[in-house]
Amino acid sequence: MPKPIKAPKAAAEHTLIALFEEEAAAVIAALKPAQAKFLTLKGFAGKAGSLIVLPEEGGCKAWLGLGARKTYTPMSFRALPSQLPKGRWALQYDAELDAHAIHVAWGLGAYSFTRYKSGSTPSEVKLDDTALDDATKTAVAREVRAHNLVRDLVNTPTNDMGPADIEAEA
């Protein structure tokens, strides 16, 4: 089993463990008996998109199935901002995975078109980024902002997109 990357626990309230089908049985066997039994009863086997969230003292612990290693895509993380309980999540994942791509996928999943909504708030489900270096954090933020700008422009009605409006967005 590949060596996992563990984010510092102090920065996050919750823990998300992402694993492949090939590793699921070994990871489940190493859990506390109650957790292992629950995951087994729920049929968790690391299938792509499968997610189990359990409350525990001081936060939650979640397991995300990434599917087979050969079919993995970082976009597996995209739906999580709308599926997980609010708070900051520390991610434990295979060290071979691209942290930049995972954080971009998470950021894309947190997108919401709020231009015409009053009182809208950003996603309250955050992925802890303390394990990323400053250059990676900057690159992730820039890429997510670019995607979100394009999505905002696509979602904006054409009658609100005169030349001055488009210039203001850019």
Please place each PLM-identified region on the residue numbering.
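Short amphipathic alpha-helical segment within the helicase RecA-like ATPase core
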Residues: M1-E169
